[in-house]
């Protein structure tokens, strides 16, 4: 029997993109899907077959210290989440009341979801685009900076703002006070084999892995040939002209063909003379480029990591946030690539990439992880899990 399934996802590519193949699969099976997010992703949501519920939800550029994310950086980011939540919660609540769904599926990174699910008595599930947490693995500890200080004034301001949000919107404080709260059903878009402490997760968690062949793009980009190095710091934290300049020094006038995505924050003129073997753009069609790349120099956002592993492309990671640091450390731990230090030099950068290219252990591990991704189930498996969950809760 067809159901109404409502999605709420933060307007960030790394969180939206993993859900769209699932949405398309649910629509294909005859379900009605509504999807609330910011306007920047409206076309993608509609293309997946969902009805867009457009929210006044635009992510702000995230700034971090060049030595790595600090407690103040984290507090500033979390406070912006609270401000966004205050702005969009009334519209989200009205939508859920006026068009009550059979199942409410929300992004694990927004507390609006569990807060309103509890307030309105909705059947709920979460989507997890990064690591999941449980009683055995403390996700919060993995996602905070190394210098995390809970007594920092800016972090205390965030805690106060979060408590005020719960009071003003009449939602249980515990639903907004826990990072990555565990829902009764949690869809995790990574394979269990990549998950930290993966063996400890029970039936509340379905590890679907990334959707295979999910993102395609019409583009004028064509591969310049091998060896191809793809460089990107993602879409959220990429204002690093110093890093991109280091890359130009490391790989300029070498045998590498380099595709380097610098985002919208960096001015191309600030990078100085561009080497002839570099193709520099704000963004590239990442899934297409990774089909041809020999190495991916990445910020280690989870979506990027999964797409790299799916294509068996070794990773040189240069994380910008604590969340990305956890991903980068896992890549290194599983010998799928190597993590670079914050103060990386051109010589070290070039040596690391060259080493990754010829490391047979990494190649073997990439093949094994790609096999795990292919057997995880992807969007069809995630849709099966949601339908079974709905059937158990009729």
Predicted regions and their residues:
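Nucleotide-sugar-dependent glycosyltransferase catalytic domains
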Residues: 3-4, 28-229, 233-257
């Amino acid at each position: 029997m067809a159901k109404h399934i409502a999605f709420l996802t933060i307007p960030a590519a790394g969180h939206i993109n993993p859900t769209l193949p699932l949405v398309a699969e649910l629509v294909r099976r005859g379900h009605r899907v509504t999807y609330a997010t910011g306007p920047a992703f409206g076309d993608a949501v509609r293309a997946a077959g969902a009805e867009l519920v457009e929210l006044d939800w635009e992510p702000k550029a995230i700034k971090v210290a060049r030595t790595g994310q600090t407690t103040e950086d984290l507090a500033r980011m979390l406070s912006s989440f609270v401000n966004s939540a205050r702005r969009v919660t009334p519209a989200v609540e009205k939508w859920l009341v006026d068009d009550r769904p059979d199942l409410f599926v929300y992004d694990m990174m927004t507390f609006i979801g569990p807060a309103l699910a509890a307030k309105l008595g909705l059947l709920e599930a979460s989507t997890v685009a990064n690591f999941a947490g449980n009683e055995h693995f403390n996700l919060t500890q993995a996602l905070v900076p190394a210098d995390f200080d809970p007594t920092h004034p800016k972090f205390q301001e965030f805690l106060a703002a979060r408590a005020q949000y719960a009071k003003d919107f009449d939602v249980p404080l515990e639903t907004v006070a826990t990072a990555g709260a565990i829902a009764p059903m949690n869809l995790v878009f990574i394979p269990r084999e990549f998950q930290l402490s993966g063996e400890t997760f029970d039936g509340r968690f379905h590890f679907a892995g990334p959707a295979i062949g999910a993102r395609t793009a019409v583009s004028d980009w064509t591969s310049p040939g091998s060896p191809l190095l793809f460089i990107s710091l993602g879409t959220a934290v990429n204002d690093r002209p110093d890093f991109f300049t280091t890359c130009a020094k490391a790989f300029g006038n070498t045998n590498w063909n380099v595709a380097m995505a610098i985002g919208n924050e960096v001015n191309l003129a600030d990078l100085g003379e561009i080497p002839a073997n570099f193709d520099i753009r704000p963004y590239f069609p990442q899934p297409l480029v990774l089909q041809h790349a020999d190495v991916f120099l990445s910020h280690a956002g989870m979506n990027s990591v999964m797409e790299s592993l799916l294509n068996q492309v070794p990773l040189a990671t240069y994380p910008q946030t604590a969340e990305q640091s956890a991903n980068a450390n896992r890549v290194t731990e599983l010998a799928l690539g190597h993590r670079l230090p914050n103060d990386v030099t051109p010589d070290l950068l070039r040596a690391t990439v060259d080493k990754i290219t010829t490391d047979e252990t990494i190649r073997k591990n990439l093949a094994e992880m790609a096999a795990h991704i292919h057997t995880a189930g992807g969007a069809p498996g995630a849709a099966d899990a949601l339908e079974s969950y709905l059937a158990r809760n009729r």
